[in-house]
From Swiss-Prot:
Keyword list, A-Z: Riboflavin biosynthesis, Transferase
Gene this chain is encoded by: ribH
Keyword Lipid biosynthesis found: no
Superkingdom of source: Bacteria
Enzyme class, spelled out: transferase
Reactions it catalyzes: (2S)-2-hydroxy-3-oxobutyl phosphate + 5-amino-6-(D-ribitylamino)uracil = 6,7-dimethyl-8-(1-D-ribityl)lumazine + phosphate + 2 H2O + H(+)
Designated name of the protein: 6,7-dimethyl-8-ribityllumazine synthase
Length: 154
């Protein structure tokens, strides 16, 4: 039986991180978690990380598509926060962000890690951006590191 697993060292690989400005007070913590994880665990150099800031989560898929089509990156990481409000807006934004990023991953055969927190409350979002429930930006970066190495073996 053959088992394929990916390590997390990705020295020399290039990563793009798409960062939503909406809910920036917690999203910056997600970005910091992603960058620190890439550098510390993946041994990725500063020059191999590109940060692209966009207005919100809805703009992430088209940005990811442009980054993927450039051929410059080994993986893309999306970090942001969408918090439920009193209207259906949450479902539209979160759903389009999730499905759009997934389409980019499959269309371009490229890891696109989802570090966009989608929560019912502000407190839940804060917990997932570096306090009680860990840092989803860091977790997304670990996923990207591993998937770069898994796909390299396939």
């Amino acid at each position: 039986m053959q088992v394929i697993e990916g390590g997390i060292n990705a020295a020399g690989k290039k990563f793009a991180i798409i960062v939503s400005r909406f809910n920036h007070f917690m999203v910056e913590s997600l970005l910091d978690g992603a960058v620190q994880t890439l550098k510390h665990y993946g041994e990725v150099a500063d020059d191999d990380i590109t940060v692209v800031r966009v207005p919100g989560a809805y703009e992430m898929p088209v940005t990811a598509k442009r980054l993927a089509s450039s051929g410059k990156y080994d993986a893309i990481i999306a970090v942001g926060a969408v918090i439920r409000g009193g209207t259906p807006h949450f479902e539209f934004v979160a759903g389009e962000c999730n499905s759009g990023l997934g389409r980019v991953a499959t269309e371009f055969d490229l890891p696109v890690a989802f570090g966009v927190i989608t929560t019912d409350t502000l407190e839940q979002a804060i917990e997932r951006s570096g306090s009680k429930a860990g840092n989803k930006g860091s977790e997304a970066a670990l996923s990207a590191l591993e998937m770069v190495n898994v796909l390299k073996q396939l």
